[in-house]
């Protein structure tokens, strides 16, 4: 039986939302559709950085995960979205230098275990966004009924970062490439530009090193469950070719590239400026095809 800390009745919406702490590091919101017995449950895994359960960061509010949760509920699908453990690190005196990529996988495994112990949900699906895609792949190997990659990279993070930087500066891109090589060989690096401090500062290097050792294409190939791979054609952070790499590696996958969808699931009809502005526009609707694609896949799982 689930322990609900708080119950909020949605008077105008066909769902209820409950605040559910899984453990001392994981707080989240369980969204349950009304009048649906044993609905499927989607666990939404956030992307990189200090991202909260709704898909927001400081000075960047778009409510991407919140919107997905609510619209899935309108289609009879439950979901659990949660704050990353980053928000609890200060409280429990966890240092940045002690954080590893595997910690986030452990968190998702804890959530899986928590909800697998409940009998209110017919299926449990992991859906990971961006960095959360790889986290979800690794956690799904421990038990899930299906997996959804939302704008998930198909290559290791060092290759993604080097490619992203090349769009801004070839010099910085090459500097990052060399720093990653040194970090991989020796465990750390000091030969990086001050402009790359956010990626290579000493306290974050152990995390980056633990992350870059995973090749998403190799990890998704280990899954024998149904897989949905979604990317947008206007994603400036993760190119649709990454989705194609994942699809080629997966044994049982469906690939969907949504036209003009950006990294946070919005339809962009203008240029790059509109794309960037969308990251801080919570009232901008989700891409119109996203929820139908998700719903069709989830309801097709046997």
How should each PLM-predicted stretch be described?
Residues 11-37:
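N-terminal cap/lid segment of alpha/beta-hydrolase-fold proteins
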Residues 146-218:
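Accessory cap/linker subdomain of secreted extracellular hydrolases
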Residues 36-38, 42-72:
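Short, surface-exposed "cap/lid" segments of acyl-processing enzymes
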Residues 96-118:
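Alpha/beta-hydrolase active-site loop
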Residues 225, 238-249:
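Short alpha-helix in the alpha/beta-hydrolase fold that links the catalytic acid
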Residues 65-91:
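Conserved alpha/beta-hydrolase
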Residues 223, 229-231:
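Short beta-strand/loop motif that positions the catalytic acidic residue
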Residues 264, 270-302:
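Catalytic active-site module of serine/aspartate enzymes centered on a nucleophile-bearing elbow/loop
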